[in-house]
Structures are given as structure tokens and as C-alpha cells.
Design a protein with these regions (language model features):
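Solvent-exposed interaction patches of small proteins and small membrane subunits
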Residues: 1-147
Length: 147
């Protein structure tokens, strides 16, 4: 785990990118069973992999940033990642769908606020943030919510 907050921007952007993709994958679904069955379960499986990535990236965030923004559920994010990674087949599709629809937007908003705060406090490099905005790897982030 990194100890310098300046390194955390990339991890938070990776999480926001994963959230943006998941929101794209669930956008057309109101029922968990429809989401689970869609595209031969591709949307569901891709979302699980992105949730694993969210957990991986959150684990890389420095203790300094986690301490500064302790209201975010860092431990639960990592815990859900571990649950998916170690019991992939046993993951409840209804609970997962509920998390994707109801918890992920809250997490997204919290992370956008953290990025905004850390940029304005000069703890993140603005140049690095601007580069990310033009990168093809970060096209699913709602930058308007941060700028």
C-alpha cells in the first residue's frame, strides 16, 4: 500500500472508471434476474470483475487518504471484493444487483467529492488529472461532477 496521498489519484480514477462501466452495463435493467441473464450473463460477469477491480484499487489507496476520508466504507469494499473473488459462483445475484443500483452511486459520489477536495487542496497533481481526462482509459468517468 502506498503511503503518499499524491499517488492515490490514479487509484480513485480507476475505481470511478470501473463504476462508470458498471453503470453502463446495468442501465437498461430494472430486475436482477434480467440483468443476470442478459447477454449470456456477460453484463453480470463483467460487473463482478469490475467490482473485484474496485476492491483491488481501494486496497492500494494510502492509509493517509483513507484516514482523511474515513467515512467511506473502505473495509467493506475490500471485503466484498474478497467475497466475489473467493466465492464467485456463490454470489447472490439479487444482493449484487441491489449493491450495483443503490450503493455504487453513493460510492461514486463520495469518490468524486474526494477527488475534488484533494485537487483543490493541491494534494493531487492537476496535470495528472487533466491527462486522465483526455485518456482513452478513463472515458467512463463523469468529470463534470469533479470539475
Amino acid at each position: 500500500m502506498q503511503s503518499d496521498i499524491k499517488n492515490d489519484l490514479v487509484y480513485l480514477l480507476r475505481i470511478l472508471e470501473s463504476i462508470g462501466k458498471i453503470q453502463l452495463y446495468i442501465a437498461d435493467f430494472e430486475e436482477a434476474i434480467d440483468f443476470f441473464r442478459a447477454n449470456d450473463q456477460q453484463n453480470f460477469n463483467a460487473s463482478l470483475m469490475l467490482l473485484i477491480n474496485i476492491g483491488e484499487q481501494s486496497n492500494r489507496v494510502s492509509n493517509a487518504l483513507k484516514g482523511k476520508h474515513s467515512s467511506l466504507a473502505w473495509t467493506q469494499i475490500k471485503g466484498f471484493r474478497n467475497r466475489i473473488a473467493h466465492d464467485y459462483i456463490g454470489i447472490d445475484r439479487f444482493i449484487t444487483f441491489d449493491i450495483l443500483q443503490n450503493e455504487l452511486p453513493i460510492l461514486k459520489n463520495q469518490l468524486e467529492q474526494i477527488v475534488q477536495i484533494e485537487l483543490s487542496d493541491d494534494n493531487f497533481e492537476k496535470e495528472e488529472y487533466e491527462l486522465a481526462k483526455s485518456s482513452e482509459y478513463y472515458t467512463h468517468i463523469d468529470y463534470k461532477n469533479i470539475d
